Amino acid sequence: MKKLVIIIGILAIVLTVAFIFWRNEVKSKSPEEGFDYVEGDTRIHVYYNRPYKKGRVIFAPDGLVPFGKVWRTGANEATYIETNKVLLIKGQELQPGKYSIWTIPNAERWQVIFNADYPSWGINFNGEANHDPSADVVKVDVPVSTTENEIEQFTISIEKTGDEMELIFLWDKTVVAVPFVVTGQ
């Protein structure tokens, strides 16, 4: 019995060390990023992982992020946004709270989805997006634009232009901007 306990203990230690090594290895390829947009009493926090292009085709029918399929909008864990104010996104209200962000990229337009469920990992065991459509709160379609400069690492930012703001996704030569307004609530 004592040998069994020792073997189980050693196995647990080995598995823990292997998991920590694997997690650090994965994170080094797509480091995590979090940022806060703060203005007055408005606070918006975004958390995501930033994969690199590394010479790959990113957005295409057979690209790393295929057209028409749900994408976790980053790598590793699910991307999320947290707000303490109501955000009016193309006429739809996103209440204060924490939401995962999912996208369905296409050549001309993207569907951007804010979802009340935020799983710890962005894909399931089948390698598919860990997205639960029944928890979708806001869905908007936005146009795709391009830039001449190639963006090597996936980037999300928030920019203010007048009274409006934009949640911006940049990668490769693709730029997607989701316009929104922070309401006073």
Residues of each region from the PLM?
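Short acidic-hydrophobic surface loop/beta-edge motif
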Residues: 33-40, 81, 85-88, 169
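Short extracytoplasmic
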Residues: 38-66
